[in-house]
A protein has these predicted regions:
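Sterically constrained small-residue positions within well-ordered secondary structures
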Residues: 10, 27-29, 117-118, 175, ...
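Extracytoplasmic soluble-region selector
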Residues: 1-43
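Histidine- and/or cysteine-centered catalytic micro-motif in compact active-site loops
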Residues: 15, 130-132, 157-159
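A glycine-rich, coil/turn loop motif that links secondary-structure elements
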Residues: 8-9, 150-152
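C-terminal, surface-exposed recognition/capping segments
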Residues: 156-215
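Mature, Sec-exported extracytoplasmic domains of Gram-positive
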Residues: 21-23, 29, 127, 139, ...
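Short, compositionally biased
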Residues: 42-150, 192-194, 198-215
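Short, solvent-exposed coil/turn segments
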Residues: 2-4, 31-33, 120-122, 147, ...
């Protein structure tokens, strides 16, 4: 857009570009063209905690998951009716992150999306936004080896951490987040989001799978 002597160009993403401005000629002015080189950088993420932000884990523009643990801070807590404990370790030498999309409206509300750049240790734990294979239910013997790239089945502690950090309770309409009642963990234990309990392995039950990863 043009306003007086100011030309405004909307950014379409990070990177370098040349902007060419061409003014039209008239009786008092000859046509002139000027080219400017610009570099657009994404905003570096500087908040103390990334919990509750969305994650684009492979920088392809698709939002992949919700961040539920931040290894920069670590932490601990309890979740559920039986107050199952969880612990988040602390790590150093972490990757740098930037805001790749602002105000993304997803199943966990409206929040910015983070992506990683550079090298270092993964700072966050991320849960996928949807169930594996469209929510298909599996016996554990069929579910235990499910993986997808760097995504794998969460441990029971990871599930407890996820539910505790995002305050997922049986009374807070967890289904609004796109979550099912019950999920397998990698050990065969399973978590009941609908009632706040965790359970030992059962060979007779069928549950969906949701994957997690560090990022």
């Amino acid at each position: 857009s043009v306003s007086g002597n100011t030309v405004t160009v909307k950014s379409v993403g990070a990177g370098s570009a040349n902007i060419t401005v061409k003014s039209a000629s008239n009786t008092n002015y000859n046509e002139k063209t000027v080219t400017y080189s610009v570099t657009v950088k994404y905003q570096t993420f500087t908040e103390n905690s990334g919990v509750g932000y969305y994650a684009d884990t492979d920088e392809n523009g698709t939002v992949d998951g919700i961040i539920f643990a931040d290894f920069k801070n670590g932490g601990s807590g309890y979740w559920g009716v039986s107050s199952d404990p969880y612990t988040i370790p602390t790590k150093t030498g972490l990757e740098e992150y930037y805001v790749s999309k602002t105000n993304y409206n997803g199943p966990f509300g409206t929040k910015d999306v983070l992506s990683a750049r550079g090298s270092g240790n993964a700072r966050f734990n991320v849960m996928a936004l949807s169930d594996y294979n469209n929510g298909t239910k599996y016996y554990f013997k069929d579910a235990k080896n499910i993986k997808s790239g760097e995504w794998s089945m969460p441990t029971i502690n990871t599930w407890i951490t996820f539910a505790g950090q995002l305050n997922i309770r049986k009374t807070n309409q967890y289904r609004e987040y796109g979550l099912k009642d019950t999920y397998w963990s990698s050990s065969g234990e399973y978590i009941g989001l609908y009632n706040g309990f965790t359970y030992s392995y059962s060979p007779y039950e069928k549950f969906p799978v949701r994957l997690s990863r560090t990022f």
